Curated annotation (Swiss-Prot):
Endonuclease that specifically degrades the RNA of RNA-DNA hybrids. It comes from Nitrobacter hamburgensis (strain DSM 10229 / NCIMB 13809 / X14). HAMAP family: RNase_HII_B. Its main location: cytoplasm. Its cofactor is Mn(2+); Mg(2+). The keyword Metal-binding applies. It catalyses: Endonucleolytic cleavage to 5'-phosphomonoester. The gene is rnhB. This is Ribonuclease HII. Residues 57-245 form the RNase H type-2 domain. GO terms for cellular component: cytoplasm; ribonuclease H2 complex. Keywords: Cytoplasm, Endonuclease, Hydrolase, Manganese, Metal-binding, Nuclease. GO terms for molecular function: manganese ion binding; RNA binding; RNA-DNA hybrid ribonuclease activity. Its EC number is 3.1.26.4.
Amino acid sequence: MTRRNNGHSARFLVASASWFSHHSGMIREPSRDRPGRSPAVAPSFQHERALLKRGVWPVAGCDEVGRGPLAGPVVAAAVVLDPKRIPKGIDDSKRLTAARREELFEEITATASFAVAFASTARIDRDNILRASLWALARAVHALPDMPRHVFVDGRDRIEIACACEPVIGGDGIVLSIAAASIVAKVTRDRLMCKLAQDCPGYGFETHKGYGVPAHLEALGRLGPSPHHRSFFAPVVAARERHRAPPIGESASATETSAGISIEATI
């Protein structure tokens, strides 16, 4: 799906194929790798600007959210910020309140080119969480309206894309376009989990977003797995065995796809 926002294009995709990771050199954030680190510094546009000065553009940032939860998809986002219209206050999504993330989401999607891709629970079960996440990241990059010439991706893994890829450990706290992608991915996934909560009430997806908090574990043990749970994550395996339920399989994909399309229409 492609949408226009103030002259910029946005695309949303549902992930449906596996991808492999590659390891290579990367930017590293010293403050996150050593004890006694200094206070967090806000991400900057200096890495993108350095490439722009060399004539390398578009430059995208890419991040994902949802590797750790017991339920719901992984959501990846790729963002190309407009150097002349960068929203103020962009930061690692984890440092922001939910309300501030929502505000910045609207500003980013109104001024930047971006794309979002979903890796369903069925894909996660089939390919494993790492491969599904890397596939969604690559899918988001390839879905951008214009293929970037350089991509900064959060983490240590390269992704299979048709342009230069630079992993950045702790990138959502260093590279501004990665931070923007982290906000887009987080808000998109949170909204999706609220939709899935309507489809499967009782688990509290709207509050914990699928993460393994005590209330979620209690509901999982009491109700058994829903079609949105990841079959091979340990607490889900235990609940499935307790309820003698088969692996969830492909049934989650259609529901997530439907919910994703609904969310795309409202964002």
